[in-house]
């Protein structure tokens, strides 16, 4: 009851008398949650000091004054001097507290409860903060250890290659001169060898980092699993990797040497932000780090695990490794089971590589391919090239290509684990699977349902059609993998040019040459194609544009459209007054050709104009926020016409498809051109970015669609998909948000879906 | 329409094109079209130039495969019939037109179903157009748009017969819509002329009174 009595007593908000003041001072200190209460209590003590009260942590007087104000109880002022520590409620008048308000016991209790809960809250917040900071420390520590172990890993590989090279040279020497070369079995390479080894090392820097990328990818995926187990969801990891990507995005396209140079650079650009994820897992990386460090310090031990495998498998190979000496088998015991897996995996690779190196008179790619897994194979291919590269000292160009595709694999596997998109994760090759034929004329636009394997196409034949990829209507009139449309939307009186779909997938919108935007409630994806006509499917028309509607895109419940009448309009389709706002640019800009919401910035839209400029508007104010243009690049903008503009889903980047065959990347904040590339043989007409922001899909009048890795802006795949009608071929491309589908729409009246 | 560089004419509808400029480019002679869709391009070009010049539109170029010519025309008809269907949707409801009829003589059964069904007129219209779209785009019967199997050509007649009923229903029950549509597109005109010329339907089925003779007269002198 100490608190209670204290509370009763603690009604004086100023220390009474000199002694009281001393008591207060004596107890001064920071006591966390309790301190203020203590302060209140101690005030009552007067000359008695804090004897009777257990809570003695005091704050400054100023805070006590506050407390008094809060309590707002008058008349109870206590001259506690005589009472000492009893905490008795003093009834005596308090001359120093003429203005003190009345105190009541319930009021005080309430106050204390209130304060208590507040302090509790603060404490838990503090705990959370602490945990966060600790996690961060662990993360940074892990990061460091990752880098360290990466370094040791690389060193190990360098040693291996040096060895392989020596073997080769020895063999060469033997073949050429018929005798053993001098110094063959010496561990220390001869001067000549050393020189060459050094050369090799520098020359092959790029491939080294890429090989380690592969290794890291395995480790990363494993760690990702661990993380998932301890509750670090992909979201958190993604946030981190996004951050890193955005950092990398700033020095865009810097490739390996740009972002930090050397090793760090290779790591950064090759493997993206995911390197960071392992760090969260303190234990594992600690163990691993210590293990690798242990290996690293004595140079000879580098090969210990390789030797271990060799003992098991090939004595002959082991003989070759003898010079590497010291096998410290005992080390293995320290390795945890999980890590053993990783280690074995790596070692396996290494052994294979060693074998390869040993027998590698020529390029021996083929014979080993049969018995190694795909992933290993990848390693090996890279490795082979390394060996060749180091021996032949050339082929760097080829290596670069390989690196790029390696990065692509990497991102792909990430994609696989991130989305529901299945796939073993390695190289994903898209193949045409479904042909959607039913339109009589060019398909201008298509859009996927956000979740279902369902899409809608819009055509110049004035109709839209709904397709369910799971309902390949085998029946009467169609061949194997053709899909028959489930529903035909008719309302436009001219070609339909653009499509949008609500995020729920319940509603879709189409804009046509007739200037109307039609709103549709999607029928069930299991509807009978020859069901009765339901007029409610067509749920409204947005009238306002006076000319063809060429662009349409949705964000939550709003849609934005652009039209040949020169305006861009923002709509809220099911409002009483659906038209929210109209944005008009100066005459000089010409008509808008395409529009998109800026995905990482609310209330911003980006509009492409005939002038080949893009303008970002604030939808609320209607003001122009930034103009995307690059003077020298865009000078003489005839032919630079923008066919399509899309916003990156996570980064402040706008991507434009141009008539002059280029795809250009813009920084939304500064409005500057970040990157520009010739992407097709003919005008680029359409763009789509996947939901994770890793891949870009482009379509062109050259009849092909291309898939691009956004990290390094390289083409991952090209597919010839459609035929020409007049001088047009592909009108639109799309990614499914959650399933592994991409699609293209063509002037030949077909739409194709690739899996 | 789009003059890019020098003499090259690029026939493209770029985003932002005004609707009056859509497909407004200099005609391209059929022999210069190297696309597999040349016939469609050619037909659309003629219609774009003057939809009322039915005779010219239906005049088959020399050395043209007749099957392909008929097939592409029928595709074009079905496509343009969407326009009539859109208009009918507004007025023709299952409550007003419970059956697909033209004159009182026949009730047409909808062939889109496993067993032909007495669909309301609007459903009949939609199902017939949807079914025609599927058939004409079928990989089985029409895998190519460059050459057409003889067995598939026979399918065209039945498609013609079915879609013609849409004209006749509109004419007898929604005359205002029909007249408006016809004034714009001359579609029934062209269709009647087409089926007569290529003998795809028997004359007694052509119940919409279109004065074919008047239009056909100059045509016959050419043909």
Curated annotation (Swiss-Prot), chain B:
GO BP terms in the entry: axo-dendritic transport; cellular response to nutrient; microtubule cytoskeleton organization; negative regulation of hippo signaling; negative regulation of synaptic assembly at neuromuscular junction; neuron projection morphogenesis; positive regulation of insulin receptor signaling pathway; positive regulation of neuroblast proliferation
InterPro entries: MOB_kinase_act_fam (IPR005301), MOB_kinase_act_sf (IPR036703)
Domain of life: Eukaryota
Pfam entry (one): Mob1_phocein
Region ranges (Disordered): 1-21
Binding site residues for Zn(2+): 92, 97, 169, 174
GO cellular component term of the entry, any: cytosol
Entries under SUPFAM superfamilies matching the protein: Mob1/phocein
Gene3D superfamilies the record matches: MOB kinase activator
UniProt entry keywords in alphabetical sequence: Metal-binding, Zinc
Coiled-coil spans in chain: none
Key word Cytoplasm present: no
UniProt key word DNA damage: no
Any one GO molecular function term: metal ion binding
Family: Belongs to the MOB1/phocein family.
Protein name according to UniProt: MOB kinase activator-like 4
UniProt organism field: Drosophila melanogaster
